Regions:
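General beta-strand structural signal in soluble alpha/beta enzymes
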Residues: 1, 25-27, 66, 105
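Glycine-rich phosphate/pyrophosphate-binding beta-alpha loops
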Residues: 4-6, 31-37, 83, 120-124
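Histidine/acidic-residue-rich, glycine-tolerant segments that coordinate divalent metal ions
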Residues: 7-11
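A structural signal for short hydrophobic beta-strand segments in well-ordered beta-sheet cores
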Residues: 15-18
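A generic structural signal for beta-strand entry/edge sites
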Residues: 21-25, 41, 88
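A short core secondary-structure module
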Residues: 27-76
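Glycine-rich beta->alpha junctions and the first turn(s) of the following alpha-helix
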Residues: 73-168
């Protein structure tokens, strides 16, 4: 969903799917696309109606589930410090032909459809972040108890105890 110039403002997406004979011709780019390095398919939200012709900026977006054609989609991995189990990528779409059959639901209603998955995904990501934070805190406590300086664990010092206790 995310694009470099739109961020979380889904209504500002610029990737465009132009209607052609039996489908659509898609051009644009996305960022933070998970598993694009290994995926065979892509879930793609693209504008099919120019934003100027829409009542709301979230109108005119259409959802597709189609083949990730590497002849038409360039995938560049984004380096990350964490969450390395899943690759994150920037993708560049150049004249990708998408059959009409690969459209999900009605044309122009894609934002409504994508919301059904975005809200649960946000909860999942929040739960993941809480788990990562809890694990980091547990490791910090273990380190404070294991690290010995001047013959005593650094966890005996109030300057170490207070931030750990505040975050427990």
């Amino acid at each position: 969903v995310t694009e470099p110039d739109a961020g979380l403002d889904t209504g500002r997406l610029k990737t465009f799917a132009k209607k052609i004979n039996n489908g659509y011709l898609v051009n644009g780019q996305k960022i933070w696309t998970s598993t694009a390095k290994i995926a065979d398919k892509i879930l793609l939200l693209a504008r099919t109606i120019p934003i100027e012709e829409c009542k709301k900026n979230t109108d005119g977006l259409t959802l597709f589930y189609t083949n990730l054609d590497r002849e038409k989609i360039e995938v560049r991995e984004i380096s990350k410090m964490g969450r390395a189990a899943v690759d994150s990528n920037q993708i560049f779409i150049d004249n990708l032909e998408v059959p009409e059959f690969d459209r999900i639901g009605e044309e122009g209603k894609g934002f409504k459809y994508i919301l059904d998955s975005l809200n649960p995904e946000r909860i999942l990501i929040a739960a993941e972040a809480l788990g990562i934070g809890k694990n980091a805190l547990s490791r910090a406590v273990k380190y404070a108890n294991d690290r010995v300086v001047f013959n005593r664990p650094i966890g005996k010092n109030q300057s170490i105890q207070h931030p750990l206790a505040e975050n427990w």
